[in-house]
Regions:
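Bacterial N-terminal signal peptides
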Residues: 10-20
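An N-terminal-biased, well-structured beta-alpha scaffold segment characteristic
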Residues: 27-144, 272
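Phosphate-binding beta-alpha-beta segment of Rossmann-like dinucleotide-binding domains, i.e.
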Residues: 138-198
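Rossmann-like dinucleotide-binding domain for NAD(H)/NADP(H)
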Residues: 143, 280, 286-375
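Oxidoreductase and adenylate-handling cofactor-binding alpha/beta cores
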Residues: 155-174, 216-220, 350-363
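Glycine-rich Rossmann-fold phosphate-binding loop(s) that bind the pyrophosphate
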Residues: 204-205
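N-terminal Rossmann-fold NAD(P) dinucleotide-binding loop
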Residues: 208-209
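Rossmann-like adenosine-cofactor binding region
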Residues: 228-324
Length: 375
């Protein structure tokens, strides 16, 4: 079976370079977009935009600036809508005064200027900055994101941390830089075989699901916690609710946080959590840095309650050069790059274009955010 989201970048590029305005563009997604939607399992909103109060066909949409071929490809999805390219946030705010929607920009300035805004498409999975803008929820603006688009590559980043921590790379890579051959630098007890180990995935959305799938394929026993119910895919042995987090943590050799940042998840991983975790467990975070009390994590690493950490996100971020987290034992840190990929931006453009088509037609958006819940 083809690996999710591992599409040929050249084919994706050709999809928009060769596209031309036609009736089919307004009628439904093209084959490449339909395949991407199916592979990622993207969900559409329950209610069509045309069935919501105050609906009227849109006239103007602000989009990120791009070359002429890209703009023509976007325009083909919404022939009756004027597209206004913006090269940065300031230009997007200036253009938003006459816009019905904005793709790629969600800032206080855009919200203040855009009195007519009815839809915003962000080009990331995280929406905490957008929904955190004062008054956003009261505006009733439909918000869609890129949930699941980065799930496959971010789950691979989780595995990179997993292998790095279980094979001593946090110790051996610095020794390599020093030209030191020391085959006993990492005790055998820390050189894990991951087969048969238990992984707890906290948050079973796009990233969590892809992580669970890969961990199961490696022979791990996968358990998970989510808020939406106790059901999950067949490769997850057991699914608990938020109230089960502490009990599940006590059983896990590896804990992976994929949660978005909300009022409920902020500083969720604190000394109480680390005290309850299985001693020596590994902690991997590709969710949000602010979901962790950093001082508590450092303390847990220093006294061995947590055996190591792989962190793509931190609090604060960027992490200052003199921050003690850099020097905590058995830690791998990457600078919020787990979504980076050689696939480029094509999948995001495909989803943005499809949602533009749906918005222009008054249809059901893909990956609409529950603004009240924050994801």
């Amino acid at each position: 079976m083809k690996k999710p989201a591992r599409m040929n970048a050249a084919l994706l590029a050709a999809a928009w370079l060769l596209a031309a305005p036609c009736a089919a563009d307004a009628a439904g997604p093209d084959a490449e977009t339909a395949r991407l939607i199916a592979e990622l399992g993207l969900q559409e909103s329950a209610t069509a935009l045309a069935d919501r109060p105050g609906w009227a066909p849109p006239k103007t949409v602000v989009i990120p600036a791009a070359d002429a071929a890209r703009l023509a490809w976007m325009q083909a999805a919404a022939p009756g809508v004027t597209l206004l390219p913006a090269k940065d946030r300031a230009e997007a705010a200036a253009l938003a005064t006459d816009a019905d929607a904005v793709i790629g920009f969600c800032t206080p300035e855009v919200l203040d200027a855009g009195a007519r805004l009815r839809w915003i498409q962000v080009l990331s999975a995280g929406v905490e900055r957008c929904v955190g803008i004062p008054g956003f929820a009261a505006r009733g603006i439909a918000l869609s994101n890129m949930q699941k688009v980065a799930g496959p590559v971010m789950s691979e980043h989780v595995l990179a941390f997993l292998f790095g921590l279980t094979r001593g790379l946090a110790t051996y890579v610095p020794l390599q830089a020093q030209g030191v051959w020391k085959d006993d630098a990492v005790p055998d007890a820390r050189m894990w075989s991951i087969e048969g180990k238990t992984m707890l995935v906290v948050g079973l959305g796009g990233i969590g699901t892809e992580t669970a799938k890969r961990a199961h394929a490696l022979g791990m026993n996968v358990i998970a916690v989510r808020n939406s119910g106790r059901t999950g895919p067949p490769y997850v042995a057991e699914v608990g609710l938020g109230a089960d987090l502490i009990a599940f943590a006590a059983r896990a050799d590896v804990i992976v946080n994929t949660l978005p940042l909300t009022a409920e998840t902020k500083q969720l991983f604190d000394h109480v959590f680390f005290d309850a975790a299985k001693r020596g467990a590994l902690f991997i975070n590709v969710g949000r840095g602010a979901s962790v009390v950093t001082a508590d994590l450092i303390a847990a690493l220093e006294d061995g309650r947590i055996g190591g950490a792989g962190l793509d996100v931190t609090d604060p971020e960027p992490l200052p050069a003199d921050h003690p987290l850099w020097r905590a034992p058995n830690v791998l840190i990457t600078p919020h790059v787990s979504a980076s990929t050689d696939l480029g931006e094509e999948p995001r453009w495909l989803i943005a274009r499809e949602n533009l088509r749906r918005f222009a037609a008054g249809g059901k958006l893909l990956s609409e955010v529950d603004v009240g819940r924050g994801y």
